[in-house]
């Protein structure tokens, strides 16, 4: 996806970051001490009333919610994708996110430069 007017894109779509109707949590974990679990737990605890889609190829459920193997397997539209994965997996997930036509992405990972990657 090439964005010709990035500022306009952000202002037009900021609502999807601040008040998304649905959130996919990529890297959702069954383990309560992991970031991918904490994201879902926080959303549930703080009363988020939109749809939450845990994404984990090795789990059927995460935090009581049906899990999906990939972003592309989610049957509905996704407003926000939260990525809680190691840096080497982020590019692949971003490509899926673009194909899914998600509106916004939040990435929580090690900084690429810190691990010797400049991409």
Please identify what each model-predicted range represents.
Residues 1-119:
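Catalytic-core regions of core metabolic enzymes
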